[in-house]
C-alpha cells in the first residue's frame, strides 16, 4: 500500500500571531487523510503553545473561501489561519 495515499500535503498560510511564532509566512505540512481545519490548528498550537490564546477567535480559510473548523481537507489544499488583527 502506498504510504502517501494515507496522507495529504497542504500549505498553511500564516498571519499575525501565527507568523510571529513560526517566523515564516507559510508552512508545507503532511497530515493524515480526513484531517479537518481544526486538526491543523491543533497541530500548530501543539508546536507553539503560546498560540492557544488565539484558538477560539481564529477564522479559517481553505482555497480562498472562509470555512468552518470541521471542514475536511484534501491533498493540495491551502489553509489560511486568520487571527483577529488590530489596526494601526
Region annotations inferred by a language model:
Residues 1-87:
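Ubiquitin-like/PB1-type beta-grasp interaction modules and other compact soluble beta-rich domains
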Amino acid at each position: 500500500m502506498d504510504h502517501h495515499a494515507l496522507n495529504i500535503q497542504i500549505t498553511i498560510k500564516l498571519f499575525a500571531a501565527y507568523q510571529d511564532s513560526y517566523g515564516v509566512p507559510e508552512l508545507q505540512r503532511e497530515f493524515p487523510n480526513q484531517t479537518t481545519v481544526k486538526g491543523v490548528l491543533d497541530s500548530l498550537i501543539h508546536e507553539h503553545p503560546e498560540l492557544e490564546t488565539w484558538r477560539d477567535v481564529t477564522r479559517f480559510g481553505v482555497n480562498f473561501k472562509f470555512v468552518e473548523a470541521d471542514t475536511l481537507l484534501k491533498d493540495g489544499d491551502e489553509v489560511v489561519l486568520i487571527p483577529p488583527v488590530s489596526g494601526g
